[in-house]
């Protein structure tokens, strides 16, 4: 066990989020082995792409070597030479800086025994006509009959392909549709949906039902505004920066066209405090207030992925006298700890049960034990994991030590009071650790662990890793751990005793979006994969009436029949496909209110209120709101 680096980091600007500070203080060759640290860095150009919140003018930055791309509401994306990242910290107009994160679509694979067609809920007098449905996703098969009018012309008003960096309007798309073959059409409009995800989402929200009414989407006569997320780079996952560009494009286009817009976002990630404080979440809240806009976001598929643990350590009170809090997790045992030294390390401790036959340089035992005041969190890392990161979030007012033990029995003791970067090696695993501090928008503290294969190794050590949390002075005692999305880690990598609550993906945690979970329409039951809401009931009860009730409601998300990328139909599952039910329903409400003149103010939070009021109870759910299905149940009752 070696403490390789305990110095203060060179890039510890309090204007930067924690993971950005860690990335800037880590050499490029080391970042390249990390799942997250190099996201946003251009290795060829040696530049960083970052998100900033700012005030005033950024003209001085734009006049130099920094490329400035202004968005909306005081947000911008900057492309900054690595050597000039310190300039941001010195620029008074820059308030806060974050690096991009990867986004993952909320779909699941596998067979489905029974299927559900969106068109089974047809509303004769409401079709979405006069309303824009914006699909920000993997693209769309624009030639599909489901996205055409009765005369064969396209219902797509605009298509912006970020991968091609080209915008196509309805005139260009109609020209392509008039071509003699699909190959010729794709020469005129070369935008394709390689995965079919965006095509399925668009079909559920607003497909025309070319194969029959049962296959129609919810807002079957709406006009479509489509953004294909991505860049020409090799790696396939879109980033939060591309989402922010897309949303800026959509709300500005809706204002330009003077049309209400319902926006569908069927993706997210697990990095963050999950409380609406990240720049992305705040950006969505601001975008939702521009024009006549409704933003619907899927709650993600992390409910059963084993990627989250939350609970409370023993509460000591301000005096530091330890006492077991109600509901506190504990090891339930008392184990002797041995003092281990070597390579300059002192005052670090190892449970007796994990000591036998393990370490050398044991110089004796001390009077110390793993007691019921200690909280044990166990993480299984599967074989062949090339890297994994773990976030530990806690209240900054709470102080406790963290002991991380590897499967071999090696361990490190983390000084959570000393901010900045620390580097360790346990077995064949290198650990980059960053102790964060509160930020201008965040009162919590993050302790970030990035586990990488050590030099000469291809994988991190597999087996059970253990976190021991020992309270020093705790007021609330609340803690929460997050792993990366289940999409990018081994199915065997998960917490031993996971907590399914608070598994919403970001940005569905934004306050002013409509957060959509999934239920199984055949069995009329909550879908266990669906991201759940808040762990502590007081988080609902003690804050403003309903802004922290998440998800807002659920919609069908299992075995949904939707258009595929090749022109046929097939079943899809996930909150990705529950979300467009609500997006389509929002479009219908705005048609009734705004287009038909019944309520010109029916957009934004008012649409959310109407949808909540119209939601129906779900079988087996007796108390509302709850963490599984949100405020009032499901939007589509069979």
Say what each PLM segment does:
Residues 160-179, 306-448, 452-457, 469-470, ...:
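Extracellular S/T/G-rich loop segment that most often corresponds to the catalytic His/Ser-adjacent loop
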Residues 239-254, 265, 280, 289, ...:
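Hydrophobic, small-residue-rich alpha-helical packing segments that form membrane-like cores
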Residues 202, 225-232, 251-261, 390, ...:
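Hydrolase catalytic cores
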């Amino acid at each position: 066990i070696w403490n390789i680096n305990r110095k203060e980091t060179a890039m510890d600007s309090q204007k930067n989020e924690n993971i950005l500070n860690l990335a800037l203080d880590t050499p490029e060759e080391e970042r390249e082995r990390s799942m997250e640290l190099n996201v946003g860095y251009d290795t060829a150009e040696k530049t960083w792409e970052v998100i900033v919140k700012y005030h005033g003018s950024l003209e001085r930055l734009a006049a130099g070597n920094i490329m400035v791309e202004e968005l909306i509401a005081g947000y911008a994306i900057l492309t900054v030479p690595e050597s000039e990242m310190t300039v941001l910290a010195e620029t008074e107009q820059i308030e806060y800086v974050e690096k991009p994160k990867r986004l993952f679509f909320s779909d699941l694979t596998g067979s489905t025994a029974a299927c559900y067609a969106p068109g089974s809920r047809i509303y004769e007098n409401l079709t979405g006509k006069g309303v824009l449905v914006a699909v920000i996703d993997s693209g769309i098969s624009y030639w599909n009959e489901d996205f055409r009018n009765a005369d064969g012309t396209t219902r797509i008003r605009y298509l912006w392909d970020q991968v091609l960096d080209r915008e196509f309007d309805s005139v260009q798309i109609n020209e392509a549709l008039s071509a003699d073959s699909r190959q010729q059409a794709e020469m005129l409009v070369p935008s394709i949906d390689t995965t079919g995800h965006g095509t399925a989402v668009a079909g559920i929200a607003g497909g025309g039902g070319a194969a029959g009414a049962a296959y129609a989407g919810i807002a079957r006569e709406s006009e479509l505004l489509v953004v294909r997320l991505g860049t020409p780079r090799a790696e396939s996952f879109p980033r939060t920066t591309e989402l922010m560009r897309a949303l800026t494009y959509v709300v500005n286009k809706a204002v330009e066209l003077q049309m209400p817009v319902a926006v569908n976002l069927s993706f997210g990630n697990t990095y963050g405090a999950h409380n609406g404080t990240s720049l992305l979440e705040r950006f969505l809240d601001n975008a939702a207030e521009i024009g006549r806009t409704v933003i619907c976001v899927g709650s993600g598929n992390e409910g059963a992925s084993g990627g989250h643990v939350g609970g409370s350590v023993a509460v000591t009170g301000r005096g530091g006298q330890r006492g077991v809090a109600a509901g506190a997790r504990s090891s339930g045992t008392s184990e002797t700890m041995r003092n281990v030294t070597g390579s300059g390390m002192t005052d670090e401790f190892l449970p007796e049960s994990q000591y036998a036959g393990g370490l050398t340089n044991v110089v004796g035992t001390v009077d110390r034990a793993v007691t019921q005041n200690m909280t044990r969190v166990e993480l299984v890392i599967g074989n062949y994991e090339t890297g994994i990161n773990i976030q530990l979030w806690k209240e900054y007012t709470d102080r406790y030590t963290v002991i991380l033990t590897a499967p071999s029995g090696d361990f490190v003791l983390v000084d959570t009071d000393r901010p900045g970067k620390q580097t360790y090696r346990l077995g064949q695993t290198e650990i980059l650790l960053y102790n964060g501090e509160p930020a201008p928008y965040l009162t919590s503290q993050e302790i970030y662990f990035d586990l990488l294969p050590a030099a000469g190794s291809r994988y991190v050590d597999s087996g059970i890793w253990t976190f021991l949390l020992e309270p020093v002075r705790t007021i609330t005692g609340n803690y929460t751990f997050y792993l990366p999305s289940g999409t990018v880690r081994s199915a065997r990598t998960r917490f031993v005793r996971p907590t399914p609550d608070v598994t919403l993906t970001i940005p569905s945690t934004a306050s002013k979006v409509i957060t959509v979970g999934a239920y199984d329409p055949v069995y009329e039951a909550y879908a266990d994969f669906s991201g759940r809401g808040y762990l502590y009931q007081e988080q609902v009860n003690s804050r403003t009436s309903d802004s922290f009730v998440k998800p807002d409601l659920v919609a069908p998300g299992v075995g949904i029949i939707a258009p595929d990328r090749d022109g046929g139909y097939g079943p899809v599952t996930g909150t990705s496909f529950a979300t467009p039910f609500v997006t389509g329903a929002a479009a219908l409400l705005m048609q009734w209110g705004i287009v038909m003149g019944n309520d010109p103010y029916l957009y934004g939070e008012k649409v959310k209120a109407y949808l909540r009021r119209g939601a129906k109870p779900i079988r087996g759910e007796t108390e509302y709101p709850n963490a599984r299905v949100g405020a009032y149940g499901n939007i589509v009752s069979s």
